[in-house]
Amino acid sequence: MVDNLPPLEPSLQNLVEQESLKWIFVGGKGGVGKTTCSSSLAVQLAKVRESVLIISTDPAHNISDAFDQKFTKVPTKVNGFDNLFAMEIDPNAGLSELPDEYFDGENEALRVSKGVMQEMINALPGIDEAMSYAEVMKLVKGMNFSVVVFDTAPTGHTLRLIAFPQVVEKGLGKLLRLKMKLAPLLTQFVSMLGMADVNADTLSQKLDDMLRVITQVNEQFKNPDQTTFVCVCIAEFFSLYETERLVQELTKCGIDVHNIIVNQLLFLGKSHNSCSMCASRYKIQEKYLDQIADLYEDFHVTKLPLLEKEVRGPESIKTFSENLMIPYKPKETAPM
């Protein structure tokens, strides 16, 4: 009987030990501590993987604050680590977010292709954000990181990030069909401008290369051996509601999800003399923890504490990250 099975390990140890994982998304409602959790997971992965990259797709870019170090759109080594790198992208910026080096080349075609591609993409509603993800994926795959952790924006953006391979595949198909019709005109136009080495094939080669990578990424996203999603929530109604919606959407998209982090919990021992507000919050959290236990009995549910101080800086994150591997137990306070 299923009811007789022991509960799953209340930690992220299963993810850290799963060597086949290539992409790990961490997401949930705003304000639940996603960045702290994703940064802590990246730190633990760095202990067992050759190279780890954490990418922030949230325009707020909180990982710079978390590690107390400025990150950019180029992967940068995190201070205090040899194999942990971080980068921040703004999906709303489209192709302009890409490093300029991506479009460098010996001929004029690559130098003008960025602007031309941006104009072509703007003609397809909804694809701009997806294309920025696509180009980042293309860059990241070329760097061969062992595993990539995504610190995602709140739920709506996250679902678009998950769906971007399908959007890009559909959009690039349209662009390539359009290219077949416009190729003679484009070649004639650039020749008039004196750029003889620019042709439609040069531009479309970028699109062909990207489509090949995105098709591969799309397959990997649907493979539970290579991709999983970690939902972060707090023990409150709206956060739990958002988490359930996210789990359902991820399941619909074919994305594996079997880990939930419940963050910012009060751990009040029997001997703990708490204030009335703390006691009240504790009761509310216990109610929603019971609901989480019922809803997600086949999930690994990790419980993390609400701390007196912010988790900020490499050393602080290293210490806090241990709670992802070993279930947190509060220190008992002596009765007064």
UniProtKB/Swiss-Prot annotation:
It is found in: Cytoplasm; Endoplasmic reticulum. The keyword Zinc applies. GO terms for molecular function: ATP binding; ATP hydrolysis activity; metal ion binding. GO terms for cellular component: GET complex. Its EC number is 3.6.-.-. ATP binds at residues 29-36, 236, 263. GO terms for biological process: tail-anchored membrane protein insertion into ER membrane. InterPro entries: Anion-transp_ATPase-like_dom, ATPase_ArsA/GET3, ATPase_ArsA/GET3_euk, P-loop_NTPase. The active site is at residue 58. It is an enzyme of class 3 (hydrolase). Zn(2+) binds at residues 275, 278. CDD domains: ArsA. Keywords: ATP-binding, Cytoplasm, Endoplasmic reticulum, Hydrolase, Metal-binding, Nucleotide-binding, Transport, Zinc. Homodimer. HAMAP family: Asna1_Get3. ATPase required for the post-translational delivery of tail-anchored (TA) proteins to the endoplasmic reticulum. Recognizes and selectively binds the transmembrane domain of TA proteins in the cytosol. This complex then targets to the endoplasmic reticulum by membrane-bound receptors, where the tail-anchored protein is released for insertion. This process is regulated by ATP binding and hydrolysis. ATP binding drives the homodimer towards the closed dimer state, facilitating recognition of newly synthesized TA membrane proteins. ATP hydrolysis is required for insertion. Belongs to the arsA ATPase family. PANTHER family: ARSENICAL PUMP-DRIVING ATPASE ARSENITE-TRANSLOCATING ATPASE, ATPASE GET3. This is ATPase ASNA1 homolog. It comes from Drosophila virilis (Fruit fly).
